[in-house]
Design a protein with these regions (language model features):
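RNA-binding accessory domains that recognize and position tRNA/RNA substrates
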Residues: 30-222, 238-278, 288, 310
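Hydrophobic/small residue at the entry helix of a nucleotide-binding pocket
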Residues: 231
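Class I SAM-dependent methyltransferase "Motif I" SAM/SAH-binding loop
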Residues: 226
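Short helix-capping/linker segments at secondary-structure and domain boundaries
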Residues: 143-155, 306-314, 421-432, 478-483
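ATP/NTP-dependent adenylation/nucleotidyl-transfer catalytic domains that generate, transfer
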Residues: 44-101, 106, 355, 359, ...
Length: 526
């Protein structure tokens, strides 16, 4: 049996097969979980050696973090001195917004294009849009800030009061928690958005107080974020059943999202986001890279879209499971891959909109009272979408899909979709959807154990909670259709599965959520 070994040293890790054949290289991103996953997939025993144990140690010993602090000098030649929010611009003639940033003199321009956008004639709505665009500029900056992790953040002419500073500090710290964990960084003493209470007039000449005193008179219809998976389709159908006028919208060019919306017999607004090419060059040159809270960025984009197109409600399909932390790092700090899908972010973002943009446009997740399995149960009955949807994230990348089919059949998202759907479908029906029986494949057992929190880290993916994964597996253990499948038989031996709770199939509308009263009234009447 071959061995996998790794040599770690400051700045770079190099994996070698049999100590002579290079498999891949990582720039400050190689961690023990990565190695464990690689070894598991390739059925290899794991042996790790360290050239400099003071830089990196395996989990369970002592995990040193590279501490970045705003009061310290730049470290390692990779850290920037200043990250600036240089400005933003919108051209009503083309529907193109430009967001400009500066990293130590390096200019980065991001472009957002809103198709066939009518420019609002109402001055208050124009002002609200520019406030929303300013918020988008601040939120989207996280994609560029992470590359240099600058000691100083210069917000330029942006309006930063204490509530906005608190929102941004939490978003950048929590939204980059996974990025920091993977790169072994401590950002707690680094990120600091300073208060700037100067209420600079926006382009209409109105102050913030003037803006908030004028109602926008937006129609009570919903702009619904679409992701191509089951959650957004359930959300869309619930609103339609409740008699709410809906408009599906997505960010990016995914063909699959277009197909799911077409199946719903609705038009799709497709907003394009073009990242700065300079960021790619920086990443190629060894800049820090990793996960960013994309849902936060898309939320800000759709807020702008709601004001341009005239929608009172900006609706996402984030469920209660997104509140669960993925893991705790070596310092006991929670790391949530889904932070920007969590209730905490939803509440913070809604409060910022009300205070800094307008109380007349409302942002919320319709599915917050639902567990993942409760959503899946509803979707299992929406058979018309079974042949067109996909939950596999390899379909949805900034640079396009990375698979030819709808399902890669070997990732946490594919596995969780199988686990969540199986209690409500026959093996043949699930095979028809995914093109494989993942629950009957020996090489999938380790991945399903991770979903259930059985001796493995929960994956850094948008999957259900450990409790509901265990409850779903327990359901399969007791189901004659599924109990003889290989993975089900293996996991049935674990006491955690035997002791799991029941599937939570009903929404809990008594729990905290942000669904507006007017929408709740329609839902209750449907």
């Amino acid at each position: 049996m071959s061995h996998l070994s790794a040599r770690m040293y400051a700045g770079r890790g190099h994996i070698k097969w049999n100590n002579d054949f290079p498999i891949t290289n990582y720039a400050n991103q190689l961690t023990i979980p990565h190695l464990r996953t690689f070894a598991t997939v390739h059925h290899l025993p794991l042996r790790v050696t360290f050239q400099n144990p003071t830089i990196f140690r395996p989990r369970g010993v002592t995990e040193p973090y590279l501490i970045l602090n705003k009061n310290s000098a730049p470290v390692s030649g990779r850290q920037a001195t200043c990250f600036s929010f240089s400005g933003y611009h919108y051209d009503p003639a083309t529907g193109e917004a430009t967001l400009t940033y500066n990293v130590d003199g390096r200019i980065l321009n991001e472009k957002i294009t809103f198709p066939w956008t009518p420019w609002p004639v109402d001055a208050s709505r124009q002002a609200a849009f520019f406030r929303a665009l300013e918020l988008l500029h601040l939120v989207a900056g996280i994609s560029y800030y992470k590359a240099g992790l600058a000691i100083r953040i210069d917000t330029g002419n942006s309006n930063i009061d204490s509530s906005m500073a608190e929102f941004l500090n939490e978003l950048y710290l929590e939204g980059l928690a996974e990025f920091a964990y993977v790169n072994k960084l401590d950002l707690t003493g680094l990120i600091d958005f300073e208060v700037n209470t100067d209420d600079t007039p926006v382009s209409t000449g109105q102050s913030l107080d003037d803006l908030l005193s004028h109602p926008l008179d937006l129609p009570g219809r919903a702009l619904v974020a679409m992701g191509g998976g089951k959650d957004s389709l359930v959300c869309l159908q619930m609103l339609r059943d409740a008699g709410v006028e809906v408009q599906p919208v997505c960010v990016g060019g995914s063909r699959l999202i277009g197909e799911t919306v077409k199946k719903a017999n609705l038009p799709l607004i497709r907003i394009q986001r073009e990242l700065s090419g300079e960021l790619t060059e920086m990443n190629t040159g060894g800049a820090w890279n990793g996960h960013v809270p994309v849902t936060a960025i898309n939320s800000a984009i759709l807020l702008c879209a709601g004001l341009l197109y005239g929608y009172r409600y900006v609706v996402f399909a984030n469920e209660s499971s997104a509140n669960e932390a993925t893991l705790k790092d070596g310092r006991g700090r929670e790391v949530n891959h889904q932070y920007s899908k969590s209730l905490a972010f939803e509440q913070n973002f809604a409060a910022v909109i009300e205070r800094h943009v307008s109380p007349d446009i409302e942002y919320f997740s319709l599915l917050r009272p639902f567990s993942e399995v409760a959503i899946t149960r509803r979707f299992s009955e929406m058979t018309e979408f079974h042949e067109v949807f996909s939950s596999c994230n390899r379909n949805f990348h900034q640079d396009g899909p990375r698979i030819t089919g709808r399902w890669c059949q070997d990732c946490p998202k594919c596995r969780f979709a199988a686990l969540a759907l199986a209690p409500f479908l026959s093996p043949q029906a699930l095979f028809t959807i995914q093109g494989a029986d993942l629950l009957d494949q020996e090489n999938q057992a380790q991945g399903f154990k991770a979903l259930c929190g059985l001796g493995e880290f929960k994956p850094f993916e948008c999957v259900g909670s450990i409790a509901e994964s265990r409850a779903a597996m327990k359901c399969l253990v007791n189901d004659p259709q599924w109990q003889d499948k290989y993975v089900v038989r293996v996991l049935a031996r674990y006491p955690e599965i035997e002791q799991a709770g029941v599937l939570e199939l009903q929404p809990d509308f008594e729990a905290t959520h942000c669904i507006p009263a007017a929408v709740m009234t329609r839902l209750n009447a449907s």
